Amino acid sequence: MRVQKPKGTVDILPEQSGSWQKVEETARNFFNRANYREIRTPSFENYEIFSRSSGDSSEIVEKQMYDFNDKGGRHIALRPEGTAGVVRAYVEDKMYAPEVVKPFNVFYMESTFRYERPQAGRQREFHQIGVESFGSSNPLADVQTIMMGHDLLGELGVKNYQLHINTLGNEQVRKGYHDALVNYFTPVKDELSEDSQRRLRDNPLRILDSKDDRDKKFLPDAPKIRDFLDDNSKANFESILKMLDQLGIDYVIDDDLVRGLDYYTGVIFEFMVEDKSLWESATTILGGGRYDHLVEEFNGPETPAVGFGIGEERLMLVLEKQNPELFKNEGIDFFITNIGEGTAQKAIEIARSLRKQGFEADFDVNQKKLKGQFKKADREGAKYVITLGEKELANGVLNIKRLADGKTIDLSLEDINDMNKVMKELKD
């Protein structure tokens, strides 16, 4: 039996999971303050949910999807990204109904799966934090979504991120751009990669997202979508940029930005971080945009929508360098040491009382010698040690010691039930 994890997966061990919890708690609190509520969707869906949303010619569908036939013969896929499952839930659970407040704003934190080469910040199972907003075509919805991404990264402690932004215009604009790309790439078709030769037929926009050197040499001179924008698309994009200016959110208009999924319409954006010690070039840690037709693709009513997703592994790599405080083990509040007959029962009772009051408290279930218990308290990063022996138990008096400076006080067993008062005395 091969006792090891599959390639492209990692174990997030207890010494690491604390920092993940802090990031997720920060994000959860941030989203709640913006009146976004959590949604949880299945880790797997019917294959068509992802193939229709991501696009049959996208790299995700062509190469990266984990899909299989289950024992009932159903074609199933593990989710490669978060949006499609949320849209499916929006339609299936009729969140478009008039009694549901619009915009319908949700966030999620979930595992996603793609078969790709494992690298720094990207595994075959990775974690995504995302938001989706359904029901508003107003540029304010785009600006709020971008602002939330910007402010969340700042609140988490990311320091050198840069917003890249572009627009894909409306359907008419994209058709004109599609034809221009076909005209540009067709004469050099035989020099393109096999994937891009197929994309030229199915969706030439995907060629712009190619990482193959055979394709990349043609990209600098490729048509730019800004040259095909109509007046409405220009006005929409300019209004978004103007509001970002007024909010003090810096950006770079990036003509090469197309995003890797077929469902995007209108504004698209990425927040990128450049760190040569992690990646050779600037890398996206948050990306999103508008997708006004995906709900209809899933047989729902016409519904404008916008959202973003964060790759949590990449985010954690950046934060480890830029916000190391996040990764410090803060330890527990109390460790109860005990020695002597009858003290073990009292130790567990004290731990229970402290935990009920909201403190982190532990004791030694193995009942090692006192020296070993103090060693464990130190290893667990306890801020205070409560010592309980037969004498203390008989007298009903405990000793509490603050390990940072050695300050000690005596307290009665009854004082344990109001530990906040004791803590105030210790601070004084």
From Swiss-Prot:
Question: Where is the protein situated, by its record's location annotation?
Answer: Cytoplasm
Q: Where are the transmembrane segments?
A: none
Q: What does the sequence similarity comment in the record state about its family?
A: Belongs to the class-II aminoacyl-tRNA synthetase family.
What is the protein named? Answer: Histidine--tRNA ligase
Q: Record the organism.
A: Lactobacillus helveticus (strain DPC 4571)
- Gene3D superfamilies per UniProt: Anticodon-binding domain, Bira Bifunctional Protein, Domain 2
Which first-to-last residue range defines the signal peptide? none
Q: What is its EC number?
A: 6.1.1.21
The record, for PROSITE patterns, names:
AA_TRNA_LIGASE_II (PS50862)
Catalyzed reactions per annotation: tRNA(His) + L-histidine + ATP = L-histidyl-tRNA(His) + AMP + diphosphate + H(+)
Q: GO terms for molecular function, please?
A: ATP binding; catalytic activity, acting on a protein; histidine-tRNA ligase activity; transferase activity
Q: How does it assemble?
A: Homodimer.
GO biological process, any: histidyl-tRNA aminoacylation
Question: What NCBIfam families does the annotation carry?
Answer: hisS (TIGR00442)
Keyword terms, alphabetized = Aminoacyl-tRNA synthetase, ATP-binding, Cytoplasm, Ligase, Nucleotide-binding, Protein biosynthesis
- GO cellular component terms, A-Z: cytoplasm
The record, for Pfam families, names:
HGTP_anticodon, tRNA-synt_His
